[in-house]
Amino acid sequence: MMIPFSWRHQHDVHTARCVRTHTITAAALLACAIIPATVGGQPTRTPDVHFVPTPMDVVEAMLAVAHVSKQDRLYDLGSGDGRIVITAAKRFGTRGVGIDIDPPRIAESKRNADTAGVTGLVEFRQADLFETDLRQATVVTLYLLPTLNVKLRPKLFAELRPGSRVVSHAFHMGDWEADTTFNVNGRSVFYWVMPSKVDGDWSLRVGDGGSERTYALRLSQNYQRLTGTATAGGHTLSVDSARVVGDSVIFTLADTTGGATARHQRMRFAGRLNGSALAGSVSGGNRGAAQWRATRGTGR
């Protein structure tokens, strides 16, 4: 459903400015006449990407996959005419900040916000997205280019809190695999949840009382993916099917040596990070359902 205000018609987008596509040639970029933006009368860096609006059905899908709500603080990097921030405010009461380096886009966004009646919920800043503080954001939306997404990735990991959501229209984040990818009328949407940092050595305790068993758990982390081992009594199990989604952790401990008892050694763990400890429930193996807890250190 379209929101009840009109966006300026973009009929000249293919003739008046560069367009963002999956393939942008150097010749196409050079063909654009770019007028430098100014701040306080001083020239600033020109836009890395020239404005092409995200279709409204894609906007709505991006907000839906991120489960945007009035509790969120949404930052749209390269916000163009402000439609993502304004739609979130209009539909969900979300407070939002649009960042764009191009002064005409900022002016247009403010007019659109006023027309939509959401000026009390949204803010538009003329700024370089790479110099923008993202620590208050719980949702970040993007429609940039693959090279810019990859350049932005370290900043997202440095400033966003675990559990924050990132949604990109059209372009991925290099080797940071999306948690979810889908298409809306032929347009790709990529979605990530910022993972907590859980790599390192842990003392893992499964069960309680006389049935408790302790493992030396060692985890390696690549973005949201985990690998590792758990050792107890000289026997080592491998960490399989493991990932981190925000502060939630799931993994399986599996006996990779084979044999008749291997099927009894597949234990499925689900838990959450709370401070410096992991805790949750485990099922499978030869002990049935139980609770588990892990604290930093090997426990040896």
Which positions does each model-derived feature cover?
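S-adenosyl-L-methionine
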Residues: 37-72, 103-136
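Conserved SAM-binding motif I beta-strand of class I
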Residues: 95-100
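A short SAM/SAH-binding and catalytic strip from SAM-dependent methyltransferases
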Residues: 134-152, 157
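C-terminal substrate-binding/active-site "lid" region of AdoMet-derived donor-dependent transferases
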Residues: 149-199
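Conserved class I S-adenosyl-L-methionine
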Residues: 71-80
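Central antiparallel beta-sheet cores of small beta-barrel/beta-sandwich binding domains
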Residues: 198-300
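Glycine-rich SAM-binding Motif I of class I
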Residues: 82-86
